[in-house]
Amino acid sequence: MKKIVIIFLILFLNHKYAYSRNIGETEITTEDGIEVFQEEKYYLLKKNVQIVSDEFELNGNLVKIFFDKDLYDIQELIASTDVNFKSNIYNIKGKGETLKFNIKNEQINVTGKKSELYLETTEMFSDGSITVNNLTGSFAIQWSNSKLISDTIFITGFMINGSLLNKSGSREISNLEVQDENILSIITEDTEMFSKKAFYDSENSIIELFDSVTIKRGNEIITGDYGVLDTYKNAYKVSSKNSNKVKAIISNTKWANFNYLTTG
């Protein structure tokens, strides 16, 4: 039989203005109190929940917190309904319908329509799921209306997976995989790229594009089955494996078909 202890924070709620949180303490406010499940090692917070600690701040209407040794030894929390989250220590903030945060693994997952996650200068959006592991730097953005935006790049796709590498105190994209059965987009300061699948390798400064490829730069538009952009040399090429033909348009000239950098 489950053991339930209900703690009503009457003093905490009615005299919040008189309370000052000390370093190392976690401040929790809720309108409907706390239900503690000792055997299962979690407790529930309901209605207008606000949690403030040294590591993070969170707001939501239903929060489930898992603990280990005692109530203060928080391991993971799951929040739902109008969730807002911010952590200055991890340089991350976000909001969504549901949020899961594993404190030990430093992994955060936001799900639901109009989900948002901000990691320093990198912005992530989706109507499905956004997951970031702060320890490994890995991230996954999935489902419709998924986007990744940074100071140097704008990406859309049904699936955007990759990792961020800490360089000189800021995170930069180190590798990337983007897929979309329709068309994905990768837009930089001077180049627009479209395809159904793309890979980015920062170590080799290469972006590879597969299927229904279009690369736009200035007055040039080139399409084909495969494209590769060398970000270090600032050069690109497009080839065709199936038709042995590539389409190109330059300035206001008409489309012309020609065998160019073919691989077939």
Located regions from the model:
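N-terminal amphipathic/hydrophobic interface segments
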Residues: Y17-G264
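Sec-dependent N-terminal signal peptides
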Residues: I4-F12
